[in-house]
Amino acid sequence: MLKKLLLLNIGLFFIPSIYAAELNSGDTSWILTSTALVLFMTLPGLALFYGGLVRSKNVLSVLMQCFAIACLISVCWVVYGYSLAFKGDGLFIGNLSAAFLNGVSRDSLVGGVPETVFITFQMTFAIITPALVVGAFAERMKFGAMCLFSVVWFTLVYLPACHMVWGGGYLANIGVIDFAGGLVVHATCGIGALVI
């Protein structure tokens, strides 16, 4: 009996970690590193890049626009963005079940990483996407109009695209795979910049 119990316990060590809902420290550290890298692409990277493309009198304006977008979109992401992008099973948009990060605890996991880390990682993509559009209207839009445009564009364009591709919506259901944001980030902001 003791041998059978010992063999059973040894066999349990070979069960793949996929079946266990536990924290993966390697994945978590990589996602945290990636989060910092994507955030540095926006602030200071994109801000300084756009600052170098405009006339010297508008450098501070472009830097402030990128910084303001980072602040505004961070707040919008926590209030309703994460919920609309990744919660619910709608084809085009999620639901508000996790508005204000309701139901997110320090113990909740998404794919082996803490959900708070996943939320922060996805927030960096939500920040950089409207910041990329700044290049289309640099030196041409007032600050208040830019803030309003960024929040409206984030809500009406980015969130549905994010949900449809990464959040299990329509495009994910038909097999679209977007690993690095080619559709969700670059196509949406490119088309948005073209329309402006």
Description of each model-found segment:
Residues 2-196:
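Hydrophobic alpha-helical transmembrane bundles of multi-pass membrane proteins
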